[in-house]
């Protein structure tokens, strides 16, 4: 997700290198502020189906016009569960993007409240003007029903889907067991 506005998906011929074959087709999808890894998978599955339907006949009839890749191919390392650990000193938008990127079907973003490991599945940027000047990063400053607001370095994040057993105002969420 990484603050990007679009995702470009390529299909290409396989070569001995990593993702460096000639490009057969390329399509893009928007990444909007409501997307998460699951909705991006949905979008990708739609365009991949379209790309294969459009290009398999061309490949079988030797009518495909390939494009040579320019520059170094890029790829991301395999994601691990530890990648989901929330660092509450980051900006609320960076934390929001992390949660969006590692939600289902991935292992999820997580934090600790004392000894309890809490998985956070959904959140939204809440506000940058409301201040809690005496609150620490990661401190729960408000609770609404089963949602809670967390103080971050530059604003507030509303946690809307989590597996915490019990939370209290003034609880401090951390990146490690305390």
Positions of PLM-derived features:
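Donor/substrate-binding cores of folate-linked one-carbon enzymes
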Residues: 1-75, 81-82
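A generic secondary-structure signal marking the coil-to-beta-strand transition
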Residues: 10, 21-22, 84, 116, ...
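Generic signature of intrinsically disordered, low-complexity segments enriched in small/polar residues
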Residues: 44, 55, 78-79, 109, ...
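Active-site-lining helix/loop region of Rossmann-like oxidoreductase modules
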Residues: 57-112
